[in-house]
Amino acid sequence: MNSVSFEDVAVNFTLEEWALLDSSQKKLYEDVMQETFKNLVCLGKKWEDQDIEDDHRNQGRNRRGHMVERLCESRKGSKCGETTSQMPNVNINKETSTGAKPHECSFCGKDFMHHSSLNRHMRSHIGQKPNEYQEYEKQPCKRKAVGKTFSYRHCVRKHERTHTGGKPYECKQCGKAFIYYQPFQRHERIHAGEKPYECKQCGKTFIYYQSFQKHAHTGKKPYECKQCGKTFICYQSFQRHERTHTGEKPYECKQCGKAFSCPTYFRTHERTHTGEKPYKCKECGKAFSFLSSFRRHKRTHSGEKPYECKECGKAFFYSASFQAHVITHTGARPYKCKECGKAFNSSNSCRVHERTHIGEKPYECKRCGKSFSWSISLRMHERTHTGEKPYECKQCHKTFSFSSSLREHETTHTGEKPYECKQCGKAFRFSSSLQRHERTHSAEKPYECKQCGKAFRCSSYFRIHERSHTGEKPYECKQCGKVFIRSSSFRLHERTHTGEKPYECKLCGKAFSFSSSLREHEKIHTGNKPFECKRCGKAFLRSSQIRLHERTHTGEKPYQCKQCGKAFISSSKFRMHERTHTGEKPYRCKQCGKAFRFSSSVRIHERSHTGEKPYECKQCGKAFISSSHFRLHERTHMGEKA
């Protein structure tokens, strides 16, 4: 008897003919083709296994054969017991270049080119998973049923690799290996810069089809959550959302046990263990673990600020900064801490705050072992080891380790103060400064030290205070080895080596190393002394001066020398005294190399080289190097004895 192939008995339609059939006729056609195929299988016909996951390898593969394979996979089993992994390479529907999609989903109305695609899609509605995975032990006859089910047989084969650890697809450029071909193919696009999916409406291109689908201008969101009614463009987003209701976290890290609801979050987390940085900047060569970080970094080169506020026109590099800014107009704080009820204007700030309750610090520095509550803090900390300063000011070309430091610096050029207190009208350069200021009105101190109970308005002050208990000094000067508790103190100290004076008085042109010194100096021009002692009425230029002065009334001397027991009103005098014991002379003259205990002493000494005499007597015109010599001279006019 001559062999009969499926092609011999199959009935074919063109797309035009198929479009003329009604739904009952299409259903009848499907049933007949399925029954025909069952009969051929029962006659003992066998075909080579078609590995569906490698469909991409044969670009000319007949789509109709693919459709039959899917169609036949959907049945629960054949009567004669033949395995359905043996599929024919046959034709059912002919595909034309018209782009017509004749198959419509009766649930959501989505259209498909092939019946097999519709069939697969329908399973997302009804939850059908006919293929069951069974894990085999070493003995061929003995098996233990895991019971995990899959919609398609090729998914079973893919799943088996998660048990065997097989990763057959390896990137030739970076050596990364993949279980499945599709992720491997997507990964290769990162190196090539290929973006094959282009939006016909706006021309924007995408590496991944899923990103392209999400971008679509149709506004169609066919996937609706039954619990909250939220709708989604793509099924994967819908699936991820459902897990927020169920709390399911199916992706678990084998190294630390942390679980994730989304595979992308899981893969990103894995890089914290492996140190993998697959995203490399072509301009500066810097590599990144995360695509989002890479995209943000590219904006530092291009200057692009894609997020613009519609109310005030201010533009931002990052969506998080933009969202936080938008809320400053409304005053809304929609994110509330479940433990203490504190509200925040961003979800990120809320998550970070919640870690202060549980003490979680999942990010650890590989160099020094210090751990952090969030990844950005770890990355910022790592720069203290590497000295990296990736953020550059376009006006003066000064570089910074942190984007926040760059933004703060940029306001020194513009003078902009966009954040205004609604209670007193005071304006600030930074939202964090405004938040701290607002607490002076509310007296709120949300950060409490567990060791001594002292509370703080600001998280940064709280962290610095904690170091007074631990003795930690994470900031080390590479030139002299001196260590500091605060990054601000460290940066100020660096200027003693560089001689940098970035703060200039607009009235007289005098420059200062520190902004506080400039502010104090400016008060000399205005004569303003805003800080008045309530006991004696004496007024001061600076708040620090009045605090020290008040101690002369109370007798408080909080700084005591451990070696000799002598106590001091101020920390600066205490530190100066300590040097009499240690012999430390950290301030060195650049011209002659002479070292001094105090910065004031080296400044006075340097004038002996420059000839500068800034203190001039108004009565006789004589000038002096130091203020102390000048004061002694003044007494000669007054008849005083020194």
Swiss-Prot record:
A zinc finger (C2H2-type) spans 103-125, 141-163, 169-191, 197-217, 223-245, 251-273, 279-301, 307-329, 335-357, 363-385, 391-413, 419-441, 447-469, 475-497, 503-525, 531-553, 559-581, 587-609, 615-637. InterPro entries: KRAB, KRAB_dom_sf, Znf_C2H2-type, Znf_C2H2_sf, Znf_C2H2_type. One of its GO terms (cellular component) is nucleus. It holds the Pfam family zf-C2H2_6. PROSITE patterns: KRAB, ZINC_FINGER_C2H2_1, ZINC_FINGER_C2H2_2. Residues 4-76 form the KRAB domain. Residues 77-99 are annotated as: Disordered. Belongs to the krueppel C2H2-type zinc-finger protein family. PANTHER family: RIKEN CDNA 6720489N17 GENE-RELATED, ZNF44 PROTEIN. This is Zinc finger protein 14. The gene is ZNF14.
